[in-house]
Design a protein with these regions (language model features):
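Aromatic (phenylalanine/tyrosine) cluster motif
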Residues: 9-10, 16
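Anion-binding (especially nucleotide phosphate/pyrophosphate-binding) glycine-rich loop
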Residues: 22-175
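Phosphate/pyrophosphate- and phosphate-bearing ligand-binding catalytic cores of soluble enzymes
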Residues: 31-33, 38-45, 84, 179-338, ...
Length: 366
């Protein structure tokens, strides 16, 4: 196994275990036809996949790659289905990651390396690290989805991002049939972005993700709402568990439970603008909610702008905007992908007209 450095990504991309890949069965994997997807996406959109495979190992992926009929089908890699909007039936192969397992890998003087298989539930993995007395990921509690999907988005919340604790990952490359390893730099993490949404899109399937958790932990209370939640709860010197519980309380209070109300979490990215653009907006809208970034740019609160346009609690057909969080689009019952996109586009247009800012949709549209 070798790490792939960002500066020589393509040159260094190598298999680390050809012998393991050669053990993949030559038989075709057990494929299900016309598989219902409504229960596999948190928005609850009714759709069907032409073909479906529950993936438990890289051997399953290798079998798909070497199967003449399956290898030509469009592919959709599915984890928890929490960042996905289906526009209709999927005329291809859904690869549903189900590989499980988490472990403590190693440690040195400053960090403990932990690893989880891609099919693990993200929130359950975070809680497992806390049960092992390994702090670091607590600010990312209760984010829906799987471990394998987390690096793709570089998930983040309450002042923390996945990249802050990321160590490395392994992925299956459908182009070469090899299993490769990427370090943090090679993943090209950015705000809700990574190489998996760029150069490796439709090519890589993440298998396992490792994190470097600090031995000398310091609480991250940079998010004002989180600090206020702890203060009002009477917590003076918060532990990682205290922070996790505070984050969970905030999220449950503000965000709808997808098991009750279909949704895909934050539907729009918070736009990032230059300080000059921010200054112009602030002069016109003194109450504009914004956050200065380390590089001097400014992140604008998309939810605030949507709220100012009057969309909070409103609906367009079977899709609506949540009454407590304008950044969240919800399924009011029987919403189709077309319903969701129609509402999203109407919101984008109103925000563009009022603020001259373009909102980017966060979930993957299929």
């Amino acid at each position: 196994m070798r790490h792939i450095l960002a500066e020589n990504f393509y040159a260094a991309s190598r298999r680390y275990n050809r012998a393991a890949m050669n053990t993949a069965t030559s038989q075709s994997p057990a494929i299900a036809s016309h598989w219902p997807l409504q229960a596999l996406n948190t928005f609850g959109i009714a759709a069907t996949a032409r073909a479906y495979l529950r993936v438990s190992s890289s051997a399953d992926l290798q079998a798909v790659r070497t199967d003449t009929a399956l290898s030509t089908l469009p592919r959709l890699v599915l984890g928890g289905g929490s960042n996905l909007i289906l526009s209709g039936d999927f005329d291809g192969l859904v690869l549903h990651l189900a590989n499980q397992g988490k472990r403590i890998v190693s440690e040195d003087d400053t960090h403990i390396i932990v690893s989880a298989q891609a099919g693990e539930n993200w929130h359950e993995f975070v809680q497992w690290t806390l049960e092992q007395n390994l702090p670091g990921l607590e600010n990312l509690s209760l984010i829906p989805g799987s471990v394998g999907a987390a690096p793709i988005q570089n998930i983040g919340a309450y002042g923390s991002e996945l990249k802050d604790f990321f160590h490395s990952l392994t992925y299956f490359d459908f182009s070469t049939g090899e299993i490769c390893v990427l370090d943090r730099e090679a993943c090209r993490f950015a705000y809700r972005d990574s190489i998996f949404k760029q150069d490796l899109r439709d090519r890589a399937v993440i298998l396992e993700v490792s994190f470097a958790l600090p031995k000398h932990w310091q609480p991250n209370l940079s998010y004002t709402e989180l600090e206020h939640e702890l203060t009002t709860s009477g917590v003076v010197a918060p532990t990682a568990r205290d922070i996790s519980e505070a984050v969970i309380a905030i999220r449950r209070r503000k965000l709808p439970d997808p098991s009750v109300i279909g949704n895909a979490g934050s539907f729009f990215k918070n736009p990032i603008v230059s300080k000059e653009v921010h200054a112009v907006l602030l002069e016109k809208y003194p109450l504009l909610v914004s956050y200065v970034q380390p590089d001097g740019s400014v992140k604008l609160a998309a939810g605030w702008m949507i709220d100012q346009c009057g969309w909070k609690g409103k609906s367009l057909g079977a899709a609506g905007v949540h009454e407590k969080q304008a950044l969240v689009i919800i399924n009011r019952g029987g919403a189709s992908g077309a319903d969701v996109l129609k509402l999203a586009q109407a919101i984008q247009e109103d925000v563009r007209q009022r603020f001259d800012v373009t909102l980017e949709i966060e979930p993957v549209l299929v």
